[in-house]
Regions:
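Non-cytosolic coordination micro-motifs
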Residues: 23-65, 102-239
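Sec-dependent N-terminal signal peptides
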Residues: 6-12
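Compositionally biased P/S/T/G-rich terminal and signal peptide-adjacent segments
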Residues: 42, 48, 52-95
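Residue-level signal for mature regions of secreted extracellular proteins and peptides
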Residues: 12-13, 199
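C-terminal motif of bacterial Sec signal peptides marking the signal peptidase cleavage site
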Residues: 15-18
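Positively charged n-region of N-terminal signal peptides that target proteins for export
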Residues: 1-5
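Short, solvent-exposed coil/turn segments at beta-strand boundaries
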Residues: 87-100, 124, 220
Length: 239
């Protein structure tokens, strides 16, 4: 892994302290009122916000994180914070800016999360049984894929979009694997097939109870599309 990508992964770890034509139950996972792959300024424009209306935690050529604390209504309920996270996947350093890869929404403790869940079901279909996400950093000395699986429960609903395995042409799988290793710590030729089977272009989570999802103390929604952005970047690099 080159030093630039290692730096990006480290920054993302700190910032996190976080298909077209698919069936009804697998609708494309899109962020509210904006789109994946958009820059900070494009997301702000979509949300009709100026820079002085948001908290900018970090903004570099590699990554960015901004928060909106204006009690915006998202999925039918008022929020207490909306966090947007951005990453630059261009390895050459010649082009590219950080683009939207994750949205994490915190709701007040008294928010009606049943309403939030129903609104998400309208957009994304029925909850899946489970989803798997992969972190962009590893514990010191750990060479395994940093893999986390979240299962549907009374206080947790999960959604996923198109699987990576379905998106990658079978005759190009080896080429994608070689390129993808630079973007995913712990990825090897040996675990590539399993990774593609479990990885979705984008995922979403709706948590409605204490410790239902590690990122939130209680109520929250997390949407993440890092794999989908890497897929588009790798595909573009192959042209």
């Amino acid at each position: 892994m080159n030093k630039k990508l290692a730096g990006i992964f480290a920054m993302c770890a700190l910032l996190l302290t976080g298909c077209q034509g698919a069936k009804e139950s697998s609708k494309e996972i899109t962020p509210p009122d904006t789109g994946w792959g958009k820059t900070v300024d494009e997301v702000l424009a979509d949300w009709n916000l100026d820079r002085d209306q948001v908290e900018i935690f970090s903004e570099t050529e590699s990554a960015a994180a901004i928060a909106v604390d204006t009690e915006a209504t998202v999925f039918g309920e008022q929020t207490s914070r909306v966090m947007f996270q951005f990453i630059n996947l261009d390895q050459t350093g010649a082009t590219g800016k950080p683009v939207l890869c994750e949205v994490d929404i915190t709701y007040p403790d008294d928010a009606d999360m049943d309403t939030v869940k129903k609104e998400m079901e309208k957009s994304y279909g029925s909850s899946k049984d489970s989803i798997t996400r992969y972190e962009l950093y590893q514990s010191l000395g750990d060479d395994q894929l940093p893999e986390y699986t979240y299962k549907k429960a009374d206080q947790l609903a999960v959604w996923s979009g198109e699987s990576l395995k379905d998106a990658i042409p079978s005759d190009k799988s080896t080429e994608y694997e070689t390129a993808w290793e630079a973007y995913q710590p712990g990825l090897t030729a040996d675990n590539w097939e399993s990774y593609t089977e479990q990885t979705s272009m984008a995922t979403a989570v709706c948590a409605s109870g204490a410790e239902a999802f590690p990122m939130f103390e209680k109520n929250g929604v997390s949407l993440e599309a890092y794999p989908g952005l890497v897929y588009e970047q790798v595909k573009s690099n192959m042209k």
